[in-house]
């Protein structure tokens, strides 16, 4: 679990009610690198007015109108992620040898490979009985299923997500354009790649009713796996 501190109107400026807690949080971050921070103002703009923490270090659930609490608010607690498959954008760029047309062709091929990997993760969960982890599936941590009931219905319709991870946006731009993704000349290319990832997730989701989403892969262990390949 990640330690999260939410910056909001009642704690973000000096003189507000919880300013003293913000100061303590900042002091703690300076010494221990935690907590992490969420801007309630920005998150509300991006997440239909909702503010909620991430799962682990950075994985946020999607806001689903099909998943609501009894009070009419969007449901987040109890939902989960089915897994991640990461596309190596650096390898796509290197494999294209700097040829832009070839880059997009290889990107689409690799995205379909990732889709197959995500399907493997999803299908591995199908048919799992709630009995394998009663605390999770029967006693409310993730759901309240009956004994012997399979978890399949929780894998569709937005209850859980499954993530297309990406890595190497900076290096991809450097290989293709010789500029960083924050440079004015390279930014449109970087955004176009991210849009392609989003569009693919949307396409798969509409076809399968599985909540595919884009995820910034942390890469601590994935880097080693990529290097071995």
Predicted regions and their residues:
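Conserved catalytic cores of very large enzyme subunits
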Residues: 1-158, 175, 179-229
């Amino acid at each position: 679990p990640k330690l999260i501190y939410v910056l909001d109107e009642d704690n973000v400026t000096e003189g507000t009610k919880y300013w003293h807690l913000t100061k303590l949080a900042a002091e703690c971050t300076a010494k221990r690198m935690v907590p992490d921070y969420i801007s309630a103002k920005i998150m509300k703009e991006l997440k239909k007015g909702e503010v909620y923490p991430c799962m682990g270090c950075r994985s946020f659930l999607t806001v689903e109108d099909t998943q609501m609490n009894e009070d009419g608010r969007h449901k987040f607690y109890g939902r989960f992620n089915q897994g991640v498959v990461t596309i190596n954008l650096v390898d796509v760029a290197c494999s294209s040898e700097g040829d832009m047309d070839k880059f997009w062709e290889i990107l689409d091929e690799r995205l379909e490979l990732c889709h197959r990997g995500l399907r493997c993760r999803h299908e591995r969960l199908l048919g799992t009985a709630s009995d394998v982890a009663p605390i999770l599936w029967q006693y409310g941590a993730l759901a309240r299923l009956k004994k012997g009931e399979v978890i399949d219905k929780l894998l569709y319709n937005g209850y859980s997500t499954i993530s297309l991870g990406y890595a190497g946006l900076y290096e991809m731009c450097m290989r293709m354009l010789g500029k960083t993704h924050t440079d004015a000349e390279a930014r449109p290319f970087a955004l176009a790649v991210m849009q392609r990832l989003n569009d693919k997730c949307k396409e798969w989701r509409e076809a399968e009713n599985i909540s595919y989403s884009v995820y910034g892969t942390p890469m601590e262990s994935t880097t080693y796996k990529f290097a071995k390949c």
